[in-house]
């Protein structure tokens, strides 16, 4: 019983690419989903009401808008979204130490202003869509993805953020540097490792958790499954297996 509860707390269902009615139908099919990720597309389409509806369904919400701007703009945005009562928000760690510190402070102030629990703030490191070749070519970087992830995770930690978002490939490396109270949230999770879609640095659920991930963001492996609830149950089983 406790084991299953722990598994439910580790899975964040990404409902990106779905409209609100499709998302609600998916959640009806998957009653054990505890966490939901709302991305940029859905939030822009539906606005803050999507948060109200999901909270009405007793879901915990990762609002993954990946803010990246000057410190004043980022912190102002974090102040506003924190008033919505979401549980986790994401910001780009590459915005710099001041932007991260100011955003964390603003998220606390925003939540406090309406008497809701402050959200965790996590720093985005290197997007899982990047391969090493694309990362070095597109961004004109000479160092490795791992080196950049380490640097951005440290920046997030030093700024007082609650964790970071990284690919499962970097989880083991980061977990050796940071204790379990520093959240490591990992997209790029696939049940079938051959199904990459637009992700490159991917891993199975069991491998990612075994390497030290706190939470897994999983979308298409569940939402595109013939039986989404069965796919979710299989993920729980894989996490629980030794």
From Swiss-Prot:
It holds the Pfam family OMPdecase. The keyword Endoplasmic reticulum does not apply. The keyword Lyase applies. It comes from the Bacteria. Keywords: Decarboxylase, Lyase, Pyrimidine biosynthesis. Substrate binds at residues 16, 37, 64-73, 128, 190, 199, 219-220. Pathway: Pyrimidine metabolism; UMP biosynthesis via de novo pathway; UMP from orotate: step 2/2. It is an enzyme of class 4 (lyase). Signal peptide: none annotated. Its EC number is 4.1.1.23. GO terms for molecular function: orotidine-5'-phosphate decarboxylase activity. Coiled coil: none annotated. GO terms for biological process: 'de novo' pyrimidine nucleobase biosynthetic process; 'de novo' UMP biosynthetic process. Transmembrane segments: none annotated. PANTHER family: OROTIDINE 5'-PHOSPHATE DECARBOXYLASE. Belongs to the OMP decarboxylase family. Type 1 subfamily. Homodimer. Catalyzes the decarboxylation of orotidine 5'-monophosphate (OMP) to uridine 5'-monophosphate (UMP). This is Orotidine 5'-phosphate decarboxylase. The gene is pyrF.
